[in-house]
Design a protein with these regions (language model features):
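Active-site helical microenvironments for divalent-metal-assisted chemistry
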Residues: 2-166
Length: 166
């Protein structure tokens, strides 16, 4: 997998004295690199979704840690990064915790997923921005009707579990 600096060794963990935390621009570049070639359900470059979620976090007053988590929110879930690569990255522990909180686990009930998001400081804002982009009517319109209906129901259920108003 690709490391944050594009090389083969991750910069040291934030706070370890090994390296300064990655900047937002470095996190964005890393996320774009590890998701290169991926597309969303509508066939659009996946980086467009990452940028939209990051924009949503920024527009909602998110912290730099939340902004970094927005760029990386699907990296572990999609297999673009391993949990170990994330752990070794020069990122604040809060960012790593948020990324792991919003990473769905195989076979995990939605209630457990939502509870983890709610229990992790900062993760709810990242998930809110993710859901907002996922449920965007213009984005959903590009999908076939059965997929659109299934995803609309899925996103509405998750919003309810997270206590988010419709």
């Amino acid at each position: 997998m690709t490391e944050p600096d594009g090389g083969t060794a991750a910069r040291g963990a934030a706070g370890s004295g090994a390296a300064a935390p990655l900047t937002t621009a470095e996190v964005e570049a890393w996320a774009r690199r590890v998701h290169a070639g991926q597309t969303d359900k509508a066939g659009r470059p996946y980086a467009e979704h990452l940028a939209a979620v990051a924009h949503g976090v920024r527009a909602r007053g998110g912290t730099p840690e939340q902004l970094a988590a927005a760029w990386l929110h699907d990296a572990v879930e999609d297999g673009a990064l391993s949990a170990g690569e994330l752990a070794r990255a020069a990122l604040p522990d809060a960012t790593k915790a948020m990324v792991l909180a919003v990473t769905k686990r195989a076979g995990e009930p939605p209630e457990e997923y939502a509870a983890r998001v709610l229990a992790t400081p900062g993760a709810l804002l990242v998930k809110t921005a993710d859901l907002a982009h996922n449920a965007d009517p213009a984005r959903l319109a590009a999908l076939d009707a059965p997929t659109r209906d299934r995803l609309t129901a899925k996103y509405a259920r998750m919003r309810g579990l997270l206590g988010l108003a419709e």
